């Protein structure tokens, strides 16, 4: 009977914590807004007009471990910010606001060379929507799943500026990111 043990010694200079801000573009298209309008008209409203700025701010925090000179593993939490869709209805007249919030966890492999980096992994996400109207509000789960994400960027002196793409079922979210990593 033999017991084999694999052990990775991680030194303090090989681990780091990161965090930063993200500016998201949510990928909502005119056809998505038209689907909302069509469903509201089907409920009996005379007309429906929906609009969104299709953007929001979020953040991420996490930990990384340097596995080799240019290779590290990262795990973290991401807040996808809030997408707001405003809808004006007539017949009867009503203003409706839909706020969609999301959170997720990420796991990625990151390769860096001469300050530039590329990373890829999976993110497990969860979104909910809150509808507010004159008669009150309601919050409902919109969906959850696990999909791929990737990022590219440049870093120096602990700061990183990059672009990230998150697949969400049959849609997507992209983000410009600014974060700081501190080795400990």
Give the residues covered by each predicted segment:
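Intrinsically disordered, low-complexity serine/threonine-rich segments
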Residues: 7-8, 42, 58, 140-144
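Catalytic phosphate/metal-binding cores of nucleic-acid and nucleotide-processing enzymes, i.e., regions
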Residues: 148-150
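Gram-negative (and chloroplast) outer-membrane scaffold detector with strong preference
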Residues: 13-16, 20-30, 59-131, 159-161, ...
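Solvent-exposed loop segments that connect transmembrane elements
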Residues: 31-49, 87-95, 129-142
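Conserved C-terminal beta-signal and adjacent last beta-strands/turns
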Residues: 154-157
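Cleavable N-terminal export/targeting peptides
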Residues: 1-15
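Generic N-terminal initiation segments characterized by hydrophobic and/or small/turn-forming residues
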Residues: 1-3, 21, 37
């Amino acid at each position: 009977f033999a017991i084999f043990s694999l052990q990775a010694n991680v030194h303090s200079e090989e681990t780091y914590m990161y965090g930063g801000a993200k500016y998201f573009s949510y990928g909502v298209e005119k056809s998505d807004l038209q689907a909302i309008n069509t469903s509201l008209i089907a409920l009996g409203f005379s007309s429906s007009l929906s609009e969104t700025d299709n953007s929001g701010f979020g953040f991420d925090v996490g930990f990384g471990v340097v596995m080799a000179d240019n290779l590290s593993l990262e795990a973290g939490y991401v807040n996808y910010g809030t997408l707001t869709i405003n809808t004006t209805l007539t017949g009867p007249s009503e203003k409706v606001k839909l706020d969609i919030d999301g959170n997720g966890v990420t796991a990625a492999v990151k390769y860096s060379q001469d300050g530039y980096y590329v990373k890829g992994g999976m993110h497990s996400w969860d979104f909910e929507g809150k509808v507010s109207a004159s008669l009150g509000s309601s919050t409902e789960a919109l969906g959850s799943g696990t999909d791929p994400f990737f990022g590219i960027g440049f870093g120096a002196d602990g700061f990183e500026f990059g672009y990230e793409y998150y697949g969400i079922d049959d849609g997507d979210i992209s983000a410009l990111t600014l974060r700081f990593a501190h080795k400990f």
